[in-house]
């Protein structure tokens, strides 16, 4: 999709040059400028969507990691308690077989703990499924965006700032643009100027 947008940008630029050289009518120039503006808006929308996708991905990853930590902690506590109850049950059986009421109570609690352990195992499987379906697709899109632009974006900066580092040249180049002080066209042209045209 980005290749098509770059091709469209090049086509629009060529049309503008043709109009300027051939003194064509103002209508043709306006049409070309309108197309360029629409394309710039589309590119900025694409960047916004990619940024949101990465933020969503990070939120999902954090949530899954926390769920796994909580689940593991609960599992360890449950496993420890289960072992303790099993030992107590064995001691009761060995000491006095007549204490059936106590044994039944412990057996019931043991069954409940086993059910809890099964529920925890189900939760772990669900967390694994979330990890294998949601995260890889988000990672793929983020890597694709990075591979095309060679830009590492700073998603923790102020929303009005566009910050990152461009690694496309021989030397890494920092990017810091205040969107309140520059137009969308300027920002887009500047970012395009960083990208290599060698394909």
Curated annotation (Swiss-Prot):
The keyword Iron does not apply. GO terms for biological process: cell division. Its main location: nucleus. GO terms for cellular component: Ndc80 complex; nucleus. Residues 46-134 form a coiled coil. CDD domains: RWD_Spc24 (cd11565). Keywords: Cell cycle, Cell division, Centromere, Chromosome, Coiled coil, Kinetochore, Mitosis, Nucleus. It is found in: Nucleus; Chromosome, Centromere, Kinetochore. InterPro entries: Ndc80_Spc24. The keyword Transit peptide does not apply. Acts as a component of the essential kinetochore-associated NDC80 complex, which is required for chromosome segregation and spindle checkpoint activity. Required for kinetochore integrity and the organization of stable microtubule binding sites in the outer plate of the kinetochore. The NDC80 complex synergistically enhances the affinity of the SKA1 complex for microtubules and may allow the NDC80 complex to track depolymerizing microtubules. Belongs to the SPC24 family. Component of the NDC80 complex, which is composed of ndc80, cdca1, spbc24 and spbc25. The NDC80 complex interacts with mis12 and zwint. This is Kinetochore protein spc24.
């Amino acid at each position: 999709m980005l290749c098509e947008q770059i091709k469209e940008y090049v086509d629009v630029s060529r049309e503008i040059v043709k109009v300027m050289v051939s003194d064509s009518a103002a209508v043709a120039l306006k049409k070309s400028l309108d197309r360029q503006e629409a394309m710039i808006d589309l590119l900025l929308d694409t960047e916004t969507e990619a940024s949101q996708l990465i933020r969503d991905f990070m939120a999902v990853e954090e949530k899954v990691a926390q769920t796994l930590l909580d689940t593991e902690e609960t599992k360890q506590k449950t496993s420890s308690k289960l072992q303790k109850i099993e030992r107590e049950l064995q001691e009761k059986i060995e000491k006095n077989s007549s204490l059936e009421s106590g044994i039944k109570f412990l057996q019931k609690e043991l069954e409940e703990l086993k059910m809890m352990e099964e529920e925890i195992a189900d939760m772990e499987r669900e967390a694994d499924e979330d990890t294998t379906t949601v995260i890889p697709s988000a990672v793929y899109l983020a890597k694709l965006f990075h591979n095309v632009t060679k830009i590492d974006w700073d998603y923790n900066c102020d929303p009005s700032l566009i910050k990152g580092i461009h690694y496309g040249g021989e030397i890494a180049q920092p990017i810091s643009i205040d969107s309140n002080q520059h137009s969308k066209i300027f920002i887009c042209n500047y970012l395009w100027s960083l990208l290599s045209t060698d394909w």
